[in-house]
Amino acid sequence: MRLSKFTWFLTALIAIIYTATLIVIRIENPHHIQAESYRCWRETYIIKQSANRAFVNTSNNRAKPVALSEGQGYGLYVTAAAGQHGWAKSRDFDQLLNYYLTHRDYVGNHHQIPTYLMQWRQYQKNGHWTSDINSATDGDLFIAMALHQAARVWPKRASYYRNLERHLTSDILAYEYNPHTRSLTVGDWATSKSKYYRLMRTSDVAPTFFDTFYQSSHDQRWRIVKNGMLDHLADLSAQHRTGLVPDFAWVTADSAKPVKPWTVASKNDGNYSANACRVPMMLANSKDPRAQKTLTRMMKFFSRQSHVTAGYTLAGKKLNHYQSASFSAPIFLAVSRNRNHGYDNLFASQKFIFSKPLPKNNYYDATLTTIAAMEGMN
């Protein structure tokens, strides 16, 4: 039976509409994942302390909230990224920023010298909020980078944000930098009088951050930090066939070695664990050959695994048999930024983090997943 011209036209039109719909869905899906990740993360983990102040709850229990400088840094970073899409306003950013500014750390023998570094933890004790002294470098780095991004997203506030960025990056170099090891320390408490002065957190190796801070300040020390810390990370990666690096390492001017268990916080201080899992994310956007080589070694190890699990010894033995978004999200972000490098299979295998709702009782998993969505789904 011959079809009429109208029937052919209608069939063709339906086919075109169907194909166009599939294309739109495919194009819009990453955008939808980004928007939903941010919305769920914001609603679950942001707590407003007052009309002008908010913090990221890291405790996974809204009844017993805990703020960390790490979490506040991530919160500012994510909010600035959301602002690029119009999902966050400068007011949202400023509420998180005001909380940071209210909890700046003091240094000196009697903690009498104010800084722009953030005190590392706040929580409720006997019905009152208390803030623990000392800073944590990872939080300060993300706060500074978020300020830089915010200046571009909200131009009317740019001078204010840039001024704060300059103060903060200056204080990072003043109080969280060891010139003898060419590295950032883990916090302002690790002074030259401390046995931890030579301790390096591998996830603080942030070459693109350091490039940005140098371009903003023209302070040559940021180049020294970048070169020193990338050298140390490459040294650590080359010590094992896996290319994996530990959470923490002891460093000198020209050497690095993993720490022993319980040196800092846990039995896994010298393994690829809860801190080092962020390293792929921190190297993802760097074109420096040392960063690329270290990242490639690590990623090829992961690409050979049937499932990437939550942590490994540096020799490649699994620490756990379950998967974790804290480990998979940074890997997804790294592979999404570095396609055709010999580990593309990780793009599909680690995408599972977006196949289920954002965790509502795991701040770390949820936050790293949100960062991976915002930066890796473009």
Annotate each predicted stretch with a short phrase:
Residues 41, 82, 93-103, 107, ...:
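Alpha-helical solenoid scaffolds that mediate protein-protein interactions
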Residues 65-75, 130-151:
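Aromatic-rich carbohydrate-recognition surfaces in CAZymes
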Residues 21-25, 276, 282-285, 334-337, ...:
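Terminal, non-catalytic domain-edge segments
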Residues 8, 17-70, 81, 87-130, ...:
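Low-complexity, Ser/Thr/Pro/Gly-enriched N-terminal "stalk/linker" regions
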Residues 66-70, 109, 115, 137, ...:
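Extended ligand-binding clefts on enzyme/binding-domain cores
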Residues 83-92, 131-139, 153-159:
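Alpha-helix boundary/capping segments in eukaryotic regulatory proteins
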Residues 1-16:
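N-terminal Sec-pathway targeting helices
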